[in-house]
Swiss-Prot record:
Family annotation (InterPro entries): PRibTrfase_dom, PRTase-like, Upp_B, UPRTase/APRTase, Ura_phspho_trans
Pathway(s) the chain acts in: Pyrimidine metabolism; UMP biosynthesis via salvage pathway; UMP from uracil: step 1/1
GO MF annotation, one: GTP binding
Binding-site list for uracil: 194, 199-201
Pfam families assigned to the protein according to its UniProt record, in alphabetical order: UPRTase
Keywords linked to the UniProt accession: Allosteric enzyme, Glycosyltransferase, GTP-binding, Magnesium, Nucleotide-binding, Transferase
HAMAP family with a match to the protein in the record: Upp_B (MF_01218_B)
Gene Ontology biological process terms from the UniProt entry: UMP salvage; uracil salvage
Entry protein name: Uracil phosphoribosyltransferase
Entry function: Catalyzes the conversion of uracil and 5-phospho-alpha-D-ribose 1-diphosphate (PRPP) to UMP and diphosphate.
Species in which this protein is naturally found: Staphylococcus carnosus (strain TM300)
Catalytic activities: UMP + diphosphate = 5-phospho-alpha-D-ribose 1-diphosphate + uracil
Activity control mechanisms: Allosterically activated by GTP.
Length: 209
């Protein structure tokens, strides 16, 4: 079973308090999501493999550490996942970025795929799927299904806020996927919004309703 990592870093929790706050405007909300995305990417990549390399400093030759093994790709779920991407890329600018477009059917609450664009070597990469919210789990499950159907094998999921129900459903559908969360909330309301949550992440990021 994949592990669930809930980050308790003080900087992440401080910024999350403003992200949740209904009085936080679009500009500040966007900047905060960007910053938390970068902080989370630092933690999500903590166990990447390193190899020894010989380098020469201005003083002498020495052995240093550099990343080895599989290369990274981040896959935001459109559209809200885009809000976390720039912060991630500011930390890992060489990472590839794919996109999976999904919308939630208002009647069934099921995720419907409408767009997929991935790096050609997706099966050779460490994949981190990115979405601010993990509510019912439907979007995350469908996005990971889509990736696996195209050959991806090493997948992680990263979000700002998750409901326990969504975590359980994602684990059931994809027990091989580790989940990384900035905050774990108790429940969903009757409209399948995370409670207390932060509202609609996409609307707050892009100033729409």
């Amino acid at each position: 079973m994949g592990k669930v990592h809930v980050f308790d870093h003080p900087l992440i929790q401080h910024k999350m308090s403003y992200i949740r706050d209904a009085n936080t405007g679009t500009k500040e909300f966007r900047e905060l999501v960007d910053e938390v995305g970068m902080l989370m990417a630092y933690e999500v990549t903590r166990d990447l493999e390193l190899q020894d390399v010989e380098i020469e400093t201005p003083v002498t030759k020495t052995t240093a550490k550099r990343l080895s093994g599989k290369k990274l790709a981040f896959v935001p779920i459109l559209r809200a996942g885009l809000g976390m991407t720039q912060g991630i890329l500011s930390l890992i600018p060489a990472a590839r970025v794919g996109h999976v477009g999904l919308y939630r059917d208002p009647e069934t609450l099921e995720a419907v795929e409408y767009f997929v664009k991935l790096p050609q070597d997706i099966e050779e990469r460490e994949i981190v799927v990115v979405d601010p919210m993990l509510a019912t789990g439907a979007s995350a499950i469908e996005a990971i299904n889509s990736l696996k159907n195209r050959g991806a094998k090493n997948i992680r999921f990263m979000c700002l806020i998750a409901a326990l129900e969504g975590v359980e459903k994602l684990q059931e559908a994809h027990p091989d996927v580790d989940i990384f969360i900035a905050a774990l909330d108790e429940k969903l309301n009757d409209k399948a919004y995370i409670t207390p949550g932060l509202g609609d992440a996409g609307d707050r990021l892009f100033g729409t309703k």
